[in-house]
Amino acid sequence: MPTHSSSRPRLLRGLTAATALATLAGGLAACGGDSDAATGTGDAASGSVTIGRLSNGAATEITLKVSEVKSISAELPADVKKSGKLVIGHGVLPSGSAPLEFIGEDQKTLTGSEADIGRLVAAVLGLEPVSRNFTWDNLFVGIDSGKVDVGFSNITDTEERKRKYEFASYRQDNLAFEVLKSNPWKFDGNYENLAGRTVEVGSGTNQERILLEWQKKLKGEGKKLTIKHYPDNNAVHLALSSGEIDAHFGPNPTISYHITQTAKSPKPTANAGTFSGAGDSLQGLIAATAKKGSGLAEPVADAINYLIQNGQYAKWLAAWHLSNEAVTKAEVNPPGLPLDNG
């Protein structure tokens, strides 16, 4: 099953779909293949990190005070501490995915919720953040080879991945229902509320698998759930605004981003409820990912917990409109998607 965001937003504020994709792809391509990107979104050495800078309206820019916590940086592996740098990998190539990770409006700076949490963690650890951009598959090659210390790239915690990697969780892995703001319907965590509805979902995705399971249950109860597919997000959003579908079911970050983009449009959308990407038996989690045995998961988790306890974490999520994916505690290697999932 897919364990990375499987739905990509097609619009950036003030840009046509074609221009937006060209902008993202061009900016990322300008960084080379698997390469470094500019990271100038704050000065951790001076005790601050700027969240949402150059996001083209995807986030609310805010500067957070955060400095090294010596008791946590003391936990770092000796080689990482000596280097003075935290090399952070992002599976952002070729085109990026707002609001998670994408090239900012200056065409060179990596921005997004994933980039920003990596910078915050580096600040707590007293390290200079160095961002490296990869394709999704090559991100893991980078971690395996030691080119990357830790990946912050919307990576789902799975038991399969624990064979090679260690995790520090920092966000819930949620799916969401997007509806017109004028539509009072709510999911409320109950599949029975889908009876009589028409819902769009991406073909071949984890969310489609979940929706098909609900459709089967409803059919057994003599109720109908109509499922539709469209070729791209533009078609999905057109169908939603025209009333052809009642809801779109997809990754929560993508939907949260699109909601911000429609806020001032004639037909704004809203979130009608979320559901764990792992299904009803487990809360899926997004986690910082390091090579197994690297000794990085523990200090990274402690850094995240420091940010949770001191308020920067909540402000980071709020800036990116992702507060509904907050965790109360970062955990090292929490239960992940089981080996037999999907």
Model-derived features with residue positions:
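C-terminal motif of bacterial Sec signal peptides marking the signal peptidase cleavage site
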Residues: 26-30
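Bilobed "Venus flytrap"/periplasmic-binding protein-like clamshell domains
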Residues: 94-95, 108-124, 155-157, 173-232, ...
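Bacterial signal peptide processing site
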Residues: 32-35
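A ligand-binding cleft/hinge motif common to bilobed small-molecule-binding domains
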Residues: 155-162, 211-213, 217-218, 246-282, ...
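Acidic, polar ligand-binding/catalytic clefts
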Residues: 128-193
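Extracytoplasmic small-molecule ligand-binding "clamshell" domains
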Residues: 41-151
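Periplasmic-binding protein-like
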Residues: 172-179, 263-302, 323-342
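Extended ligand-binding regions for polar small-molecule ligands
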Residues: 47-70, 123-124, 205, 283-319, ...
